[in-house]
UniProtKB/Swiss-Prot annotation:
Active site (catalytic residues): 68, 107, 122
Function: Participates in the detoxification of a plethora of hydrazine and arylamine drugs. Isoniazid, 2-aminofluorene and anisidine are preferred substrates for NAT-1. No activity with p-aminobenzoic acid (PABA) nor SMZ.
EC id: 2.3.1.5
Binding site for CoA: 103, 208
EC class: transferase
Family the entry assigns: Belongs to the arylamine N-acetyltransferase family.
Reaction(s) catalysed (UniProt annotation): an arylamine + acetyl-CoA = an N-acetylarylamine + CoA
Residues annotated with N-acetylmethionine modification: 1
Keyword line: Acetylation, Acyltransferase, Cytoplasm, Transferase
Record-level GO cellular component terms: cytoplasm
Protein known as: Arylamine N-acetyltransferase 1
Residues given in the record as substrate binding sites: 106-107
Top-level lineage group: Eukaryota
Organism: Mus musculus
Length: 290
């Protein structure tokens, strides 16, 4: 696997020698704006693989995206290859409808240590929950970013990532009450510990998320990509475009239904994706917010 091919894929052309926070931030931002958070393979009759070579070929060679177990695995590899001090971590996603964290470790994230300071790096949570900068691993400190204010807190060895969100304006009244809209201003995102993980720790959940009727990834197709101003999302056949802070403390969220003839063009123009197999959009009853 060629790190230069990875840099070309994400459009990164700056220093690879300075292992500092600025470089880490740039790599994160280039990847999150080039590599979609998506599960389209599952809705094209294909599997989501964990093998790093498969992930590299899928994302770098075929210019696709993936979910956290793939996208953050690739980021972990790239940062390690560059020489950063990295640790793979596992997270438990907050499930809003039942007000609790997942019982299974379903999220992969990365810890990076720079000059004895630890940071959380995650390029694969998607939608308006995606961090745009590494988060300093410190408890109880508001960390304002473009998407929202992020907050890490620690309790008895468990860390919690939360988000304080802005108001949102939806100009099309048809979608004002859409179930895709996040209704909470204060949003819990996930919990994690600092126990080092390896990719094999995620083998069971990688299979479970692709097969269980209880998995939102089975019931819903999604694709999400950060932009310079916000984020694009395609959930089932509904396309949304969010512009962060389009006016003071308000996000603009625009909706559009995409018909079958438009899907291919939307995937190409908004997400840079060209599929090899027929895609069947799906939006089930399980809650999925943007």
């Amino acid at each position: 696997m060629d790190i230069e091919a990875y840099f070309e894929r994400i459009g990164y052309k700056n220093s690879v020698n300075k292992l500092d926070l600025a470089t880490l931030t740039e790599v994160l931002q280039h990847q999150m704006r080039a590599v979609p958070f998506e599960n389209l393979n599952m809705h094209c009759g294909e599997a989501m693989h964990l093998d790093l070579q498969d992930i590299f070929d899928h994302i770098v060679r075929k210019k696709r995206g993936g979910w956290c177990l793939q996208v953050n695995h690739l980021l972990y590899w790239a940062l390690t290859k560059m020489g950063f001090e990295t640790t793979m971590l596992g997270g438990y996603v907050y499930i809003t409808p039942v007000s609790k964290y997942s019982s299974e470790m379903v999220h992969l994230l990365v810890q990076v240590t720079i000059s004895d300071r630890k940071y959380i790096v995650d390029s694969a949570y998607g939608g308006s929950y995606q961090m745009w900068e590494p988060l300093e691993l410190t408890s109880g400190k508001d960390q304002p970013q473009v998407p929202a204010i992020f907050l890490l807190t620690e309790e008895n060895g468990t860390w919690y990532l939360d988000q304080i969100r802005r108001e949102q304006y939806v100009p099309n009244e048809e979608f004002v009450n859409s179930d895709l809209l996040e209704k909470n201003k204060y949003r819990k995102i996930y919990s994690f510990t600092l126990e080092p993980r390896v990719i094999e720790d995620f083998e069971y959940v990688n299979s479970y998320l692709q097969t269980s009727p209880a998995s939102v990834f089975v019931s819903t197709s999604f694709c999400s990509l950060q932009t310079s101003e916000g984020v694009h999302c395609l959930v089932g056949s509904t396309f949304t475009s969010r512009r962060f802070s389009y006016k003071d403390d308000v996000d603009l969220v625009e909706f559009k239904y995409v018909n079958e003839e438009e899907i291919e063009d939307v995937l190409k123009t908004a997400f840079g994706i060209s599929l090899e197999r027929k895609f069947v959009p799906k939006h089930g009853e399980l809650v999925f917010t943007i």
